[in-house]
Design a protein with these regions (language model features):
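Sec-dependent N-terminal signal peptides
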Residues: 4-14
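Boundary at the C-terminal end of the N-terminal hydrophobic targeting segment
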Residues: 17-19
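Residues embedded in well-ordered secondary-structure elements
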Residues: 21-22, 90
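Short N-proximal segments of mature Sec-exported proteins
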Residues: 22-72
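Compact alpha-helical subdomains of small soluble proteins
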Residues: 51-124
Length: 124
């Protein structure tokens, strides 16, 4: 009986430990990483403030750090980001998508907006 209780508790604890980012959340985070990377590499002449490039790079770092913290392997994360970057690289700045990504970070990562601000400050 103790063995079964231990197995059930172990299973529950394991599932709770990996509950930080669902597949849907991962997809959104990868899409946002692709959008942010595209923002950073916008061609010259595109209307875009330099501070937004910094915020984009900081956001990518915060998303990756959080993903690794909740148990996503670096290899899996990088593969997802690379696909998203391929999808968005060379596209024009999309303010709506970028703002949606800011909201995703603020709402799905504990202290996400503050973490982005902190990383931006370290870029100088």
């Amino acid at each position: 009986m103790k063995k079964y209780t231990f197995i059930i508790l172990s299973f529950l604890i394991f599932n709770l430990a990996h509950a930080g980012m669902s597949n849907s959340d991962k997809s959104k985070a990868w899409e946002c990483s692709g959008i942010y990377m595209a923002n950073y590499f916008l061609p010259s002449g595109e209307q875009f403030e330099y501070s937004m490039k910094e915020k984009s790079m900081a956001s990518v770092k915060v998303l990756k750090t959080y993903a690794l913290e909740v148990g996503i392997s670096e290899k899996e994360w990088d593969e997802g980001v690379n696909k998203a970057v391929d999808k968005y690289y060379g596209s024009k700045y999309d303010k709506t998508k970028t703002e949606d990504c800011h909201s995703i970070i603020a709402n799905s990562i504990p202290n996400g907006a503050e973490k982005v601000k902190k990383v931006v400050q370290t870029l100088y």
